[in-house]
Amino acid sequence: MTYSQVLASIQSTSWPDFAVFYIFLGGAMTCLGLSSTFHTVSCHSEKVCADWNRCDYIGIVTLIVGSFFPMIYYGFYCAPLLQAIYLGMISLFGGATIVVAVASHFRSPEFRWFRTGLFIAMGLSAIFPIAHALIIYGWRLCFDVISLNHMLLMGSLYISGALIYGARVPERWFPGKFDIWGSSHQIFHIFVVGAALVHYYGVTKTMAYWHAQNHSCQKEIELMVPS
């Protein structure tokens, strides 16, 4: 089921539903757009390569932050204060990550694992809102209210891709064999696209669940039925 199909099937959606989805979608498009531009122009000159490499890092952060928005919005659908706290947390974390990632000092090859670890840590900060949601709703209901299974799969894909990229596998084992196809960077991008698609599907399921079960926030959590 696509996002458009979900919107067409329910009447209770409002502007925040559109906003959080398009923030996520915009983050994904920004990430992939900046990355593809970087790879296209990186051979132009050292300066152009360095400038667009910074844009590439900014795109990664934008995707991570954008992915948080629908998860936090629906995870705390009836708790605006918690929404604000966690959205503020990831936004500040994202801003700090951009400042560090684009600094000239940290762009050198010897800081590759530092940058990789920074992006992984940023993604793993989702543990805090997810743990909070588990306390509020319980394990079973979280598969619906935040689409926990999709969240876990998405996180696994992002982390796996980042580790492959950081380890430079498989080209480190077979130098010169993956210069055109099959390099770690290409594998990383495949994992990123897969994770974004998984999250897209999870967001549509979560939105459909909330609007079917408790869109007005008048039902007690104990009365919400797992799908």
Residue ranges, per PLM feature:
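Multi-pass alpha-helical transmembrane bundles in non-GPCR membrane proteins
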Residues: M1-S227
